[in-house]
């Protein structure tokens, strides 16, 4: 199934790139929470929804762009969790740091994940406890790697005072910034060793990256030390977390 999901992510990426390269208008509007949504978000959502319904018609789908109500999903044990375009702000900035995220959740855990960066044409994927990176047609296993001083990857769009204080107390380290779920992937492939995030995050923003990082050997825990959980609940928010090799 993983190969089919990867192809689906590529197809969604192709739809996004038609907007990114100017073939189709971007049409930026604001959602109720003031976050931006574009024609690319909607196009990718449509591709993924149609594809998953064909691939696995018995597994329900929760997508950021059309999340079903609590009464519909409260008893779900196995479901797809999708962010058709993670990093819409990066997309609008045209810096290439956005991804297509597709995860399969089973009893609260992401057991399969795909993170595809269309501009970079890089695919990260995970299933059955293994993680891969595919670039330039070459697919290889990836795993976490220690480094001293550690490289801490942080959000390009969500820096805050709490993060600044945390980094001041961390000890010797280096930092880099990147958008979207690529932060999870940098830890997964050994380029970074730590990704701290403070404040709540929507579940579709983390599930696919969580799957990739965990399969590569990283720990994805909240600040109380508990693994991030995707068991259906009324809120779509997970607490702050850290992705770490330690």
From Swiss-Prot:
UniProt KW keywords: Cell inner membrane, Cell membrane, Hydrolase, Magnesium, Membrane, Metal-binding
Mode of membrane association: Peripheral membrane protein
EC number: 3.1.3.7
Residues annotated as binding Mg(2+) 1: 64, 83, 85
Main function: Converts adenosine-3',5'-bisphosphate (PAP) to AMP.
Family as reported in the entry's similarity comment: Belongs to the inositol monophosphatase superfamily. CysQ family.
UniProt xrefs under PANTHER family: 3'(2'),5'-BISPHOSPHATE NUCLEOTIDASE 1 (PTHR43028:SF5)
Protein name (database record): 3'(2'),5'-bisphosphate nucleotidase CysQ
Encoding gene per record: cysQ
């Amino acid at each position: 199934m993983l190969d089919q999901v990867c192809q689906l992510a590529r197809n969604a990426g192709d739809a996004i790139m038609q907007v990114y390269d100017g073939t189709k208008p971007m049409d930026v509007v604001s959602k109720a929470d003031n976050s931006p949504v574009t024609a690319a978000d909607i196009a990718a959502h449509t591709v993924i929804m149609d594809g998953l319904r064909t691939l696995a018609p018995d597994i329900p789908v929760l997508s950021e762009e059309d999340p079903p109500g609590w009464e519909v999903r409260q008893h779900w044990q196995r479901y797809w969790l999708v962010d058709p375009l993670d990093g819409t702000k990066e997309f609008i900035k045209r810096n290439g740091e956005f991804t297509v995220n597709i995860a399969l959740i089973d009893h609260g855990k992401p057991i399969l994940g795909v993170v595809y960066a269309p501009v970079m044409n890089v695919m990260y994927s995970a299933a059955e406890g293994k993680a891969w990176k595919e670039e330039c047609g070459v697919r290889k296993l990836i795993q976490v790697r220690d480094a001293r001083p550690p490289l801490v990857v942080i959000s390009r769009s969500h820096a805050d005072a709490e993060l600044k204080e945390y980094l001041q107390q961390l000890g010797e380290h280096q930092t880099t910034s990147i958008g979207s779920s690529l932060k999870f992937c940098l830890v997964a492939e050994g380029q970074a060793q730590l990704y701290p995030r403070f404040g709540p995050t929507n579940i579709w923003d983390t599930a696919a990256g969580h799957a990739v990082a965990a399969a590569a050997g990283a720990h994805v825990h909240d600040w109380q030390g508990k693994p991030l959980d995707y068991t259906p609940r009324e809120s779509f928010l997970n607490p702050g977390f850290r992705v770490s090799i330690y």
